[in-house]
């Protein structure tokens, strides 16, 4: 792809073997910052598809992939082998560990944490403001925290500050208002525990279950 077809701002480091699609922007300065003020680092083997915008100050590991039109705000830490689907939005100060998969049309706000191997289905919404527009809303922001191997079904909503336990499974369309225990399956609005992941035959041989396996 011709360099004229995308925009790479100053102070951006992209390792070898990257594939960058048309109309991609990398190193976009945050509001009030000058171009190149924050360093942006992307590891080897990245595939960044068309119309994706990556703000400055991100540190991204190896073999990173996006769909089309993903938006990644500033000052995030993203591990190796992470994929972010088309039209998903990652706000600033988010931590995404190795092997996390985020599908299309997902919204992840600032101060969220996704640990190793977490999986987020399409249309999922994380929230981080318990009382939006309240006087101390900005000071009390707290995003959801996904422990390793947590799986979030399509169109689920996670309320601020909830922790989704290791290898837990959140059903499609669930509204999670409380922490989810390790290995639990939750469904509904509000989400409630209905079984354990170890009871689902499809997961019995899943190496991600670790010591939760029977």
Model-found features: residue ranges?
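A short hydrophobic/aromatic micro-motif that marks alpha-helical segments and, especially, helix-coil
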Residues: 50, 203-205
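Short cysteine/histidine-rich zinc-coordinating motifs and their immediately flanking basic loops
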Residues: 31, 199-200
């Amino acid at each position: 792809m011709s360099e004229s077809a995308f925009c790479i701002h100053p102070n951006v480091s992209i390792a070898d073997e990257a594939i960058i699609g048309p109309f991609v922007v990398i190193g976009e300065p945050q509001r009030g910052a000058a171009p190149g003020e924050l360093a942006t680092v992307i590891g080897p083997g990245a595939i960044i598809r068309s119309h994706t915008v990556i703000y400055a100050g991100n540190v991204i590991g190896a073999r990173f992939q996006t769909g089309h039109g993903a938006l990644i705000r500033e000052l995030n830490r993203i591990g190796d082998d992470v994929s972010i689907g088309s039209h998903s939005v990652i706000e600033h100060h988010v931590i995404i560990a190795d092997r996390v998969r985020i599908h299309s049309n997902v919204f992840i706000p600032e101060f969220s944490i996704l640990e190793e191997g977490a999986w987020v289905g399409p249309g999922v919404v994380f929230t981080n403001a318990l009382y939006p527009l309240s006087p101390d809303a900005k000071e009390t922001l707290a995003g959801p925290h996904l422990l390793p191997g947590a799986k979030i079904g399509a169109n689920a909503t996670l309320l601020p500050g909830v922790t989704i336990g290791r290898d837990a499974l959140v059903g499609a369309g669930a509204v999670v208002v409380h922490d989810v225990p390790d290995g639990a399956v939750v469904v509904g609005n509000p989400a409630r525990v209905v079984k354990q992941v170890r009871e689902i035959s499809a997961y019995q041989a899943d190496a991600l279950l670790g010591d939760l396996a029977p």
